[in-house]
Amino acid sequence: LVDSIGKKISVVKDVVKQLGLKNVEPQQVRAENLMSRKYHFIVSRAVTQMEKFYPWVKGRFRKEDVHDEFQNGILYLKGGDVDEELEALHLNYVCYHLEDYFREPFFETKKVVYIPFEGKR
């Protein structure tokens, strides 16, 4: 788990410890500065436009999938209209509307965008 804000990472480290999670490594670093590691999934809230975010992470995926239903890729929490932004990048994606799963007004415009890793096909 990555965030540039130290207070957030401190909380995440405590949660990881309290839950006894073994496959989580919180790091205080900016996503665009991650260069050496590869990941199965990259999960993010919309920190910037996808055209800026995608180049930061596109080479950061492991080739072997760990999930039967989803191949490795990006899960991106985003509000508003995502289609125009994503279609401009010519990427395959699936948009999950959170209002289909949660009733609170906050989720009415929120989506999780799944972009599968395309590098192994």
Spans of model-derived segments:
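Conserved SAM/SAH cofactor-binding pocket of Class I
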Residues: 1-44, 54
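A short SAM/SAH-binding and catalytic strip from SAM-dependent methyltransferases
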Residues: 39-61, 76
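Short, well-ordered coil/turn elements that cap or connect secondary structure elements
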Residues: 21, 36, 69, 90-93
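Conserved beta-strand signature within the Rossmann-like core of class I S-adenosyl-L-methionine
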Residues: 64-83
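Short alpha-helical
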Residues: 6-7, 48-52, 81-84
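Active-site capping/gating segments
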Residues: 79-121
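Short, well-ordered alpha-helices that flank and scaffold nucleotide-derived cofactor binding pockets
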Residues: 14-17, 59, 88-91
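Conserved beta-strand segments of alpha/beta enzyme cores
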Residues: 23-25, 73, 94-95
